[in-house]
């Protein structure tokens, strides 16, 4: 085939494509023409149709050769000609905005029911579920037809039947435009629908008749986009599982099926963006990503599975309403699965159990399903089976997420409040905060206030993680988003920090940050001061679950037994506003016995903090009328018996002058411990004359001096000698609206990090600050060592965590470091009478309070002459005659193994001084519970379990530490008679000699030979019990002697030996940088 024939074929192919494109343009123009005819008084002239679509055809044919900007001339919905400058010509009527659509319907009505129009036209209205097409159907009487009438009329009037295509666009929905009618069934609250409709009415440019608007409000508008509607379409959830269960693979399927990531960019474990994560095949950091699926917004958080990063899981649970519990179908329930399940139960969030890897031939689906039903009390219909690798049944999981996981809880507070659960440092934007918006909305250029650090910043950028940062104009309630404020100081940010609008904060006369109620839009709740407690937490702190509406009198009636029945959790669930409506007197009436029975804890829980505490019997006793009247703080103070003494009328009243304090004697008043803890002695509010506060304190002069101004105080309870006159504080501290703090993760492993090059010590400190910002469980402080110089004492959650931090310092900041031997915190009990003055001053700074610690087998002898301190540095422990006892940390360890390997597991645990507690049998697997020394399980314990069980065993431990007394010896390492502090360690009496010998022999192989003799020794106190030597490097000084007297040879050798002795005295042994990691079996690349 020659060159000319090839060109001919190409030309014919091009002509065929041009013809097909022209046919497509003709079809589109015909549909456009029908729409234009509807807007131009519905002219049905066939001549006009032909002329217009032929003209349109010619125009399209000419413009396909160039893709430039040009001007089009068309008529808008009002009949006026407008000129529009466009790029890339598209269908002008693919989407009609609110005013245009409603104007069209009004024109339809005017055209159909015009008396001068002899011809009866019909427009049919119908909702098509499969396609996004809305068809209007209106009969002659201006009423909707039934489905049968509609079908019959369609057959008779096919030519008078018009379709209006309205494509759903999510971007338009965010602009409060009209959504598809199929979404209308989601919203069942008519009040919300009316509010949404009123917002659309304000947005319209064209005036509407009330009759038409009412009709559209009920039948056409459907679900309208407003803030209250939007929250119901948000689902915040996380994926939790043991390591290597397929979490990241499932996250990839989520990204694919929601079209969040294009196929060209898609790769395996897309959310594992760190190089270390891809190399090691594990997830190290939680990742948040925003996805869209069927008009719903999915905020997914992918979490790590290794127990060294368990703090990431805890932080995720605080911002999610649901969780997917993923189980490996090939391995079944593992140790971390148990820990995750119990943690989920603590947070009381919805759990969706999912069995993954059903595509494997070795999948144990039936066995795992039975374990979930029997062990975790799941129902059979709640358990899903999927294949994350091939995407099987993942869409079914989407439907379960929509139906089972609740949306974010709606609050009526309009001010912004968000909680920080993650952060990282960007070179250009500073500290980037990952937050969840609890209520309100946040826009750019808004000034925010950090409640805990009391600092304010101006928002530079807000947006969503998709998973890259995508800026937007506003983030609203329920969203998980990022915030940039150009924060450069990493110490200003704390995890679980609460941020609010700066506008709602002011300073009172005592230089405290308090809530400015003038700036808060209270919505439907206007009597906020009556609902606030003395801390203000009942109303402002948490997003509540709703409102319990009473009868006509606003009362909550009890059953025959005089009880208010609770759910399984012992709670009374409220509605969306979190309110219990009372009658006009603000009372809740009780039964005939005047009692409200509570749960086992003696509480009736409304929202997370809204509790009604009762006496020891779990009862609140009332007067004859069954009423309990409260003070201005909404509280009822009880006596020793847990009762409130009333007068004849069953009420606690103040005097006639609205509770003014006419006389006061200090001896008649009991001091309240709560107020004695406050540093402020008397608080006097000058802004509010009618209401104020004072705290009882032991300073008589201040009380007498300030109590003279009686008009500024009001009494809450008076008439009882033992009663304390406590007044409501009109200024609510801003910390009272802070969100619940995320549970802190305390380090379990400590070691020192030093820089190989001392000049980079400042860079090392900056890098550690940035890593701490991104990893809240990591902690450090400055430390100086005599041998290694300036460094940092760092805390980690495990050896893998330590290894990851060291690798990140090297890769991200290009700093070579030396890491010392890992250690744990020991509790030391010291005899004070044997200490000298210098040692006493050194240790008194480390005195430790043991009241909140779990210590077993403590001596009952008097501890007046002893005190405790905690340390991870062996060199801080004094000599044996000063130390009374050393307490070692133990943790409860869960080990799951197949039954055939149980003897190997038990031997390994007993070898490491484990204490057996119990074991459970689950099918052919056994769950062991041991109490293990933390120092023993850190070093290669998991590797040993994996090798003993051929990879089927798993191990995890709780973060609760129990201290037990142990016979521990302090071992020092000497190199050339010089003690190396960084190599000292504690060892148990049972195996200290074996550990020391192994350590010394390893040092011998790791230290390179020098030109002088190197002696390595291990000593217990001052007794040396292990010693090794490294022979020096020698030069053959006698090589030049070819004969002669032997004395010549001896002189040369003696001279060399003398030089070696001098070098031994003044020479320094150089230790390789990675000696500590290799010495203690920490795997390093």
Swiss-Prot record:
GO terms for cellular component: mitochondrial inner membrane. The keyword Membrane applies. It catalyses: GTP + H2O = GDP + phosphate + H(+). GTP binds at residues 241-248, 302-306, 356-359. GO terms for molecular function: GTP binding; GTPase activity; ribosome binding. It is a peripheral membrane protein. It is found in: Mitochondrion inner membrane. Keywords: GTP-binding, Hydrolase, Membrane, Mitochondrion, Mitochondrion inner membrane, Nucleotide-binding, Protein biosynthesis, Transit peptide. Its EC number is 3.6.5.-. The keyword Cytoplasm does not apply. It is an enzyme of class 3 (hydrolase). It comes from the Eukaryota. Promotes mitochondrial protein synthesis. May act as a fidelity factor of the translation reaction, by catalyzing a one-codon backward translocation of tRNAs on improperly translocated ribosomes. Binds to mitochondrial ribosomes in a GTP-dependent manner. This is Translation factor GUF1 homolog, mitochondrial. It comes from Plasmodium falciparum (isolate 3D7).
């Amino acid at each position: 085939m020659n060159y000319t024939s090839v060109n001919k074929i190409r030309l014919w192919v091009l002509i065929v494509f041009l013809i097909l494109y022209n046919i497509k343009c003709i079809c589109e123009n015909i549909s456009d023409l029908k729409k234009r005819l509807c807007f131009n008084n519905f002219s049905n002239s066939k001549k006009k149709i032909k002329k217009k679509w032929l003209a349109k055809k010619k125009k399209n044919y000419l413009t396909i050769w160039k893709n430039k900007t040009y001007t089009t001339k068309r008529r808008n919905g009002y009949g006026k000609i407008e000129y529009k400058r466009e790029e890339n010509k598209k269908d002008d009527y693919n989407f009609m905005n609110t005013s245009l659509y409603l104007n069209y319907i009004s024109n339809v009505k005017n055209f159909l029911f015009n008396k001068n129009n002899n011809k009866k036209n019909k427009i049919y209205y119908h909702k098509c579920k499969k396609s996004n097409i809305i068809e209007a159907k209106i009969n002659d009487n201006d009423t909707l037809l039934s489905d049968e009438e509609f079908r019959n009329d369609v057959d008779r009037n096919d030519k008078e039947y018009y379709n209006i295509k309205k494509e759903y666009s999510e971007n338009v929905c965010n602009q409060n435009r009209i959504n598809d009618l199929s979404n209308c069934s989601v919203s069942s609250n008519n009040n919300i629908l009316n509010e949404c409709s009123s917002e659309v009415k304000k947005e319209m440019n064209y005036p509407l008749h009330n009759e038409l608007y009412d009709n559209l409000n009920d039948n056409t508008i459907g679900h309208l986009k407003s803030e209250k509607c939007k929250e119901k379409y948000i689902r915040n959830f996380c994926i939790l599982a043991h390591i290597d269960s397929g979490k990241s693979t499932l996250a990839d399927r989520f990204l694919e099926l929601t079209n969040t990531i294009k196929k060209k960019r898609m790769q395996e474990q897309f959310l594992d963006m760190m190089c270390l994560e891809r190399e090691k095949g594990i997830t190290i950091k939680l990742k948040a990503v925003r996805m869209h699926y069927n008009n719903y917004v999915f905020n997914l958080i992918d979490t790590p599975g290794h127990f060294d990063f368990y703090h990431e899981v805890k932080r995720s649970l605080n911002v999610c309403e649901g969780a997917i519990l993923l189980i490996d179908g090939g391995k079944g329930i593992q140790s971390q699965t148990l820990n995750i399940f119990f943690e989920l139960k603590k947070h009381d969030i919805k759990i969706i159990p999912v069995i993954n890897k059903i595509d494997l031939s070795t999948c144990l689906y039936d066995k795992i399903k039975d374990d979930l039903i029997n062990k975790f009390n799941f129902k059979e219909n709640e358990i899903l089976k999927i294949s994350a690798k091939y995407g099987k049944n993942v869409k079914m999981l989407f439907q379960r997420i929509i139906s089972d996981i609740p949306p974010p809880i709606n609050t009526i507070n309009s001010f912004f409040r968000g909680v920080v659960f993650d952060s990282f440092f960007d070179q250009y934007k500073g500290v980037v905060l990952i937050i969840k918006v609890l209520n309100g909305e946040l826009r750019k250029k808004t000034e925010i206030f950090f409640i805990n650090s009391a600092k304010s910043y101006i928002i530079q950028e807000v947006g969503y993680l998709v998973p890259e940062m995508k800026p937007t104009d506003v983030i609203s309630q329920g969203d998980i988003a990022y915030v940039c404020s150009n924060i450069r100081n990493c110490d200003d940010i704390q995890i679980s920090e609460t941020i609010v609008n700066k506008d709602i904060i002011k300073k009172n006369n005592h230089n405290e940050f308090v809530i400015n109620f003038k700036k808060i839009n209270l919505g439907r709740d206007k009597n906020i001061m009556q609902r606030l407690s003395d801390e203000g937490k009942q109303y402002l702190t948490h997003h509540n679950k709703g409102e319990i509406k009473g009868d006509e009198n606003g009362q909550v009636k009890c059953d025959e037994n005089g009880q208010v029945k609770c759910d399984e959790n012992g709670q009374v669930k409220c509605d969306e506003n979190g309110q219990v409506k009372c009658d006009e007197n603000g009372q809740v009436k009780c039964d005939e016995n005047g009692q409200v029975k509570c749960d086992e804890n003696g509480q009736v829980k409304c929202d997370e903090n809204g509790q009604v505490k009762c006496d020891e019997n779990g009862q609140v006793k009332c007067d004859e009328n069954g009423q309990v009247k409260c003070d201005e703080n909404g509280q009822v103070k009880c006596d020793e018996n847990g009762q409130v003494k009333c007068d004849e009328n069953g009420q606690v009243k103040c005097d006639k002058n609205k509770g003014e304090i006419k006389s006061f004697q200090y001896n008649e008043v009991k001091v309240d411990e709560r107020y004695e803890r406050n540093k402020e002695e008397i608080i006097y509010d000058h802004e509010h004359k009618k209401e104020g506060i004072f705290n009882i304190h032991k300073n008589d002069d201040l009380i007498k001096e300030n109590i003279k101004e009686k008009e500024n105080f009001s009494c809450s309870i008076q008439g009882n000698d033992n009663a304390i006159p406590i007044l409501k504080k009109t200024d609510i501290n801003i910390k009272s609206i802070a969100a619940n703090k995320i549970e802190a993760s305390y380090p379990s492993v400590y070691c020192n990090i030093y820089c190989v090059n001392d000049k980079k010590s400042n860079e090392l400190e900056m890098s550690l600050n940035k890593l701490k910002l991104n990893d809240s469980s990591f902690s450090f402080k400055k430390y100086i060592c005599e041998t290694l110089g300036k460094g940092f004492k760092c805390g980690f959650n495990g050896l893998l965590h330590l290894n990851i931090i060291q690798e990140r310092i090297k890769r991200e900041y290009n700093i070579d470091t030396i890491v010392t031997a890992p250690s744990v915190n020991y509790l030391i009990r010291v005899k004070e009478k044997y200490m000298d003055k210098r040692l006493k001053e050194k240790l008194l700074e480390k005195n430790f309070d043991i009241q909140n610690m779990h210590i077993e087998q403590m001596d009952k002898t008097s501890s007046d002459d002893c005190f405790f301190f905690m340390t991870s540095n062996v060199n801080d422990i004094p000599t044996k005659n000063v130390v009374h006892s050393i307490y070692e940390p133990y943790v409860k360890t869960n080990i799951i193994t197949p039954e055939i390997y149980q003897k190997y597991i038990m031997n390994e645990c007993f070898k490491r001084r484990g204490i057996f507690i119990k074991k459970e049998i689950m099918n052919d697997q056994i769950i062991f519970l041991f109490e293990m020394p933390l120092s023993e399980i850190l070093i290669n314990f998991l590797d040993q379990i994996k090798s003993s069980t051929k990879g089927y065993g798993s191990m995890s431990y709780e973060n609760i530490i129990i201290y037990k007394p142990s016979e521990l010896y302090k071992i020092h390492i000497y190199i050339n008679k010089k003690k190396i502090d960084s190599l000292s360690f504690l060892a148990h009496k049972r195996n200290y000699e074996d550990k020391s010998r192994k350590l010394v022999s390893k040092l011998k192989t790791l230290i390179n030979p020098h030109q002088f003799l190197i002696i390595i020794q291990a000593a217990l106190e001052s007794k040396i019990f292990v010693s090794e030597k490294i022979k020096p490097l020698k030069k053959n000084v006698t090589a030049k002697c070819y004969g002669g007297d032997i004395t010549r040879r001896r002189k040369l050798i003696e001279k060399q030996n003398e030089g070696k002795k001098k070098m031994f005295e003044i020479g320094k042994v150089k230790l390789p940088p990675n000696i500590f990691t290799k010495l203690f079996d920490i795997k390093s690349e």
